[in-house]
């Protein structure tokens, strides 16, 4: 796996699924391929994206700044600086300085990532802030190691939280989670269906599912009533894809 592929993988792992993730993936690909060279426009676009947390925007801004060639005097962006200040905690800043000194001695991506993984997310963000604000310099490879270590920590905590939700025994949370998944699956079906004649059936199924979820939420239903809703939808979607000659088995 090439370095940039690895960076793209780690960065995308912390972004919630949805159309925005697909858009960000495209921007990252363009930036890494040298197709997007207007850093100012890129940062303005990033700043106004909804849904993303300030830290995620800060990390993306840092990656764009590292990758896109820019004039020496180009202003640093406040939204990135604020996201990478370690919540203003002096402890984070102290640890970030210690980490920075260690990173100065590293020359490889993996070496830097290994060193960085033993620090807290706050310290890692502060260290990125130091480099972003030009208070310290490391090689691009080392900076990317720092980025990936930060993303790995964030993805780990997201995964733990997701696992807790999936394995919860609380029937109300499980019920709501099934309805949310059914709703997003229906949305994906509508987007994939396009405008062909065979698509009408898939669109109908998706529309009915969304109406059903809407009704269940409106009148309030027994927590077990949503069981199998998403699986039924996926079966319909896969049957539709088979007829269309498309084989995508990755939704489950």
Curated annotation (Swiss-Prot):
RNP-binding as annotated region, ranges: 165-252
GO term, biological process aspect, one: viral budding from plasma membrane
Renumbered residue ranges of the record's region Membrane-binding: 1-164
Keywords: Host nucleus, Membrane, RNA-binding, Viral matrix protein, Virion
A Pfam entry, by short name: Flu_M1_C
Bilayer topology annotation: Peripheral membrane protein
Gene3D superfamilies: 1.10.10.180, 1.20.91.10
Compartments, as annotated in UniProt: Virion membrane; Host nucleus
One of the record's GO cellular component terms: virion membrane
Main location: virion
Note: Most abundant protein in virion. When expressed alone can form virus-like particles in transfected cells.
Function: Plays critical roles in virus replication, from virus entry and uncoating to assembly and budding of the virus particle. M1 binding to ribonucleocapsids (RNPs) in nucleus seems to inhibit viral transcription. Interaction of viral NEP with M1-RNP is thought to promote nuclear export of the complex, which is targeted to the virion assembly site at the apical plasma membrane in polarized epithelial cells. Interactions with NA and HA may bring M1, a non-raft-associated protein, into lipid rafts. Forms a continuous shell on the inner side of the lipid bilayer in virion, where it binds the RNP.
Similarity annotation: Belongs to the influenza viruses Matrix protein M1 family.
Subunit description: Homodimer and homomultimer. Interacts with NEP. Binds ribonucleocapsid by both interacting with genomic RNA and NP protein. May interact with HA and NA. Cannot bind NP without genomic RNA.
Record protein name field: Matrix protein 1
Organism encoding this protein: Influenza A virus (strain A/Swine/Netherlands/12/1985 H1N1)
Lineage per the UniProt record: Viruses, Riboviria, Orthornavirae, Negarnaviricota, Polyploviricotina
